Amino acid sequence: MGRALYICCGLAIFFNYLNIDWIYQGLEEYGYITGRSVVIKCISLALLVVFVKTREDYVAYALLTSLALGGNYIFNVIHARKMVGFTLVNLKIRKHIKPIVFIAGIIFMSTIYNKIDITMLSALSTDEAVGYYSYAQRTVNIVLTMCSAVTAIFLPRLSYYYDNEKAVFYKLMDKGFQILCLGVVPLAVGLFLTANQAVVLLYGDSFTPTGTTIKLMCPLILIKGFGDLLCYQLAYSSKNEYILLPGSAIASIINVITNSILIPLYAQNGAVIASVMSELTTNIIQFLYLKRKIKYHISNTALVLSLFSTMVMAAVVCAIIKMNLPLAVALAMEISIGGAIYLLMNIALKNRILSEMLTKVLKKHNTGFQDS
């Protein structure tokens, strides 16, 4: 069974050679990406229900997970033939080797940096601490995925406009920052306030310590959210990606040192503090370097409006928490009412980026209504 499990998991490595998601991201084919993901996930979910029934079915689970990943990539290759002619003739591979090796180095260092917490935690602490950390990381990653999805759509346009129209590039950077302010700040604060309730509801009373771990991880939502645009996206689009490799190396070194000191003292919470410190340090270094090299301007108005609106939202959420309602009811009210208050505050304060987004949605809705 052990060999079968390795083979099933190893299929993901094989399928990765077919990964051409970057084509669709570059062409901004997000409709196709979403549709493909929904279809594959529905099929894989149905197969999981049919073939995975007990804990002994872990090999089937691993196989279906790898096949779901491979299905995405195979769909991509088939669909890409409509846009790209694949050939093995007259390939000029040499000119691509250096940038590929460099980017691979960045990904390798980032992978080590992101995985080292769990590795050191399992070596220096208990299995319970690893479990608390894993569940906290899984919860925070849901929010981080939403943030990275927002910034990912900017990379193709930033790269194009940096080479062709600098004025539009600067406007796009400012717009991206405003959108992040609108979403990242309330998400980080909201998760911080509701962490304890969410943990009990999702994972049970036995995982109560995970609530504190999630709260300590919340700064990572701000650091990685803004850092993704102001460091990573900016570095790649402006051809300054070479700063990312030493940045990842510095983060890894800081992480190892701080983990070795803090994990024996604070277990999973020490690992979180180490991650926050290393992530903050490397993002500050990259931000200062890129800001000095690329003279872009970002308006702080959106950040001020978001902070003020988030404070009002937080006050409302705290008031609901003190009402001692049933857990599921309280959490639903905190999310819905808190979110509504935040949006209403931004509308009242005339947040420009939110007004633009609402105008586009209303215009699209009215157009669709008239067509029908």
Predicted segments with their positions:
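Interfacial/gating helices of multi-pass transporter permease domains
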Residues: 58, 95-103, 121-141, 167-172, ...
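Alpha-helical transmembrane segments of polytopic membrane transporters and translocases
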Residues: 102, 117-119, 131-148, 176-179, ...
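Alpha-helical transmembrane segments of multi-pass membrane transport and lipid-handling proteins
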Residues: 1, 8, 171-225, 253-264, ...
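Interhelical loop/hinge segments that connect adjacent transmembrane helices in multipass membrane
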Residues: 58-65, 71-114, 119, 153, ...
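Helix-loop junctions and terminal segments of transmembrane helices
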Residues: 140-184, 231-237
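Membrane-proximal transmembrane or re-entrant/amphipathic helices at the cytosolic face
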Residues: 318-372
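Membrane-interface helix-capping segments at transmembrane helix termini in multi-pass transporters
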Residues: 1-14, 54-61, 201-214, 323-333
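Short runs within selected transmembrane alpha-helices of multi-pass transporters and secretion channels
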Residues: 8-25, 36-44, 61-77, 106, ...
